[in-house]
Amino acid sequence: MGTRQTKGSLAERASPGAAPGPRRERPDFWASLLLRAGDKAGRAGSGLPPYHRRVGMVQELLRMVRQGRREEAGTLLQHLRQDLGMESTSLDDVLYRYASFRNLVDPITHDLIISLARYIHCPKPEGDAMGAMEKLCRQLTYHLSPHSQWRRHRGLKRKPQACLKALLSGNPPDNMVDLSGIPLTSRDLERVTSYLQRCGEQVDSVELGFTGLTDDMVLQLLPALSTLPRLTTLALNGNRLTRALLRDLTDTLKDPSKFPNVTWIDLGNNVDIFSLPQPFLLSLRKRSPKQGHLPTILELGEGPGTGEEAREGTDQQDPIGSPVTPARGQESTECVIQT
């Protein structure tokens, strides 16, 4: 007589040779990942910079849409928006109030996310909607990751230290110190500080995006950076910086002798820096009074820059110099993004 086989034993016996089913990501997986990232990222330099997680979410979102899983893609988009600090619930609200969001640290990412929301929540049957979706995801991936830096610095991925040594020798080309995409250590920062002190009179721009910087590492560089007399732009995007650093930067900017000619500091795509405080923006504007594209909440809430006039003015450039899409809320009056 044969032995009685239970469902459990059959499952165990069949599992090694069973063909795996389609892989489906659980929505709660991304939610728990964001919670863990919020607790740990940026503390004492632990973990990877958040752009790794965000790029992974964009790629997974595109995969879901290709498979026709729009509901799951919408849920994942909510998690991505949460990770990027976009708390608005209505797509119309985002579009109509875009001018008031101009103090966002990374308007380009937010504009791409809004476009993604349109394709996911309000799909249009005509035209190549999937092609447009793929293009948006490529643009967002490119913007959130250091691909452009790898192209600028040949051999960066293979020999980052050799690349750093070459960049810190001689005078800065085009008056720019471009170290973007090169992972930096505390010891490297000492070499960078010495270089800035030696060649600081020539430096107009410093690029430190995607270098793995933490708050403490930026504070280590701050004395050298803040005394560069010709510095106009400072890029700190794609690192592990937190809101705590904004207090130090804002306090430094209150001193007119520090960062005397800086017009913009790029803090996008970091851990939890989603908007810039008004004292920070006002200090920048005092240094560049002729630049009218550094608005504050006070200006947008009073005087001639309110209501329809504020919306009509949103076709000027945003603080990082790229065109801002005008509000087009009338195109999506039925669309609401769930949170």
Swiss-Prot record:
Under InterPro entries, the record lists:
LRR_dom_sf
Region: Disordered; residue ranges are 1-25, 294-339
Highest taxon listed in the record's lineage: Eukaryota
Q: Which residues carry this modification: Phosphothreonine?
A: T325
Modified sites of kind Phosphoserine: S322
Signal peptide from the UniProt entry: none
Q: Which UniProt keywords apply?
A: Leucine-rich repeat, Phosphoprotein, Repeat
Composition bias, Low complexity: 11-21
The LRR repeats extend over: 203-216, 228-241
Is Cell division among the key words of this record?
A: no
List all Polar residues biased stretches: 330-339
Q: Which family does it belong to?
A: Belongs to the LRRC75 family.
What's the protein here called?
Leucine-rich repeat-containing protein 75A
Q: Which organism is it from?
A: Mus musculus
Tell me the organism's taxonomic lineage: Eukaryota, Metazoa, Chordata, Craniata, Vertebrata
